[in-house]
Amino acid sequence: MDPIFQSLQTVIDHYDELNEQLADPEVMNNGQHYMKLSKEAGEIRQTVEVYTRYKQVIQDIQDAEELLGDAEMAPLAKEDLSALKPEKEQLEEQLKILMLPKDPNDDKNIIMEIRGAAGGDESSLFAADLLDMYRRYAERQNWSMSIIDESTTEVGGYKEVAVMITGDNVYSKLKFESGAHRVQRVPATETQGRVHTSTATVGVMPEFEEIDFELNESDLEEEFFRSGGAGGQNVNKVSTAVRLIHKPTGIMVKMQEERTQIKNRDKARKLLASRVYDFYAQQNESEYAAQRKSAVGTGDRSERIRTYNYPQNRVTDHRIGLTLNKLDRIMNGELGEVIDALVIADQTAKLAELNK
């Protein structure tokens, strides 16, 4: 048997143990512990179900092969084998994918940062278009998105915007969106009808709670100030806005979206923790760098990953050579085909590495 299957029985045994614990009245009365065990069981349930079916198919193949020597039953046995053997191969591939090492961040919420880059006003407008695309995709996934920091431009775009996206397995779906996104289109301000090229960068970071990554208070410098406004009643007369600086890295975060200092500081700490963690993770040239590298890019924000060509209604993902002539639908949040292709490419590369 392939080495990857050798640990499957351990998974089955662990699943059985989890179900025994979940049936324990004491565990059922401990809501937090019960939820933790339920989540753990849910994460491996598909593996258990596929492996159970796989073992049944193996047994059915053996039974059918034993009937090949029976003249009366042989035709029926051959018919069964013609269906069972392809299913066996499909289940084996599915199990290999299910048994690939999981990214520990896959089930986390994310902080996504989008910045207008090369292209002036047009790049800021494209940053806003990307935000709308991700918002619509999030709605299709029943996720929630909220803006935690933003810097707008006079033309209605974004110099930069940071959002929190929460829901099931958000990072697993959007982690491949980090990089430089290039747009080719005729800007609204272009009078000659010429196509311009602009760029916006996207950064995707898993949301880190204190349990994952701790910011030392001694490393933080904080300032409180009044949040901006249009004047009159809109100007906050109390210093509710917060600026946090991580002194070792110089990373700075400011937050003024909330009405209270406590809420702004809490949001600022979460954003700062994710940025600092991401900074150190990218500096690590050994273990984390090897984990982060994949068939679909490094995750570096400067790496050009995708081009959106409006005149030709075309989107091209350069990492996997995928081209789709449905830009209008993709910008409307129909990102599933692109994201699924990226996930499959990543899994295929990992399987190839495993089989070396």
Swiss-Prot record:
Q: How is it modified after translation?
A: Methylated by PrmC. Methylation increases the termination efficiency of RF1.
Q: Does the keyword Electron transport apply?
A: no
Q: Which InterPro entries match?
A: PCRF (IPR005139), Pep_chain_release_fac_I (IPR000352), Pep_chain_release_fac_I_sf (IPR045853), Prokaryotic/Mito_RF (IPR050057), RF-1 (IPR004373)
Q: Which organism is it from?
A: Leuconostoc mesenteroides subsp. mesenteroides (strain ATCC 8293 / DSM 20343 / BCRC 11652 / CCM 1803 / JCM 6124 / NCDO 523 / NBRC 100496 / NCIMB 8023 / NCTC 12954 / NRRL B-1118 / 37Y)
Q: Which PANTHER family match?
A: LD18447P
Q: What does this protein do?
A: Peptide chain release factor 1 directs the termination of translation in response to the peptide chain termination codons UAG and UAA.
Localization in the cell: Cytoplasm
- An MF annotation (GO) of this entry: translation release factor activity, codon specific
Main location class: cytoplasm
- What's the protein name? Peptide chain release factor 1
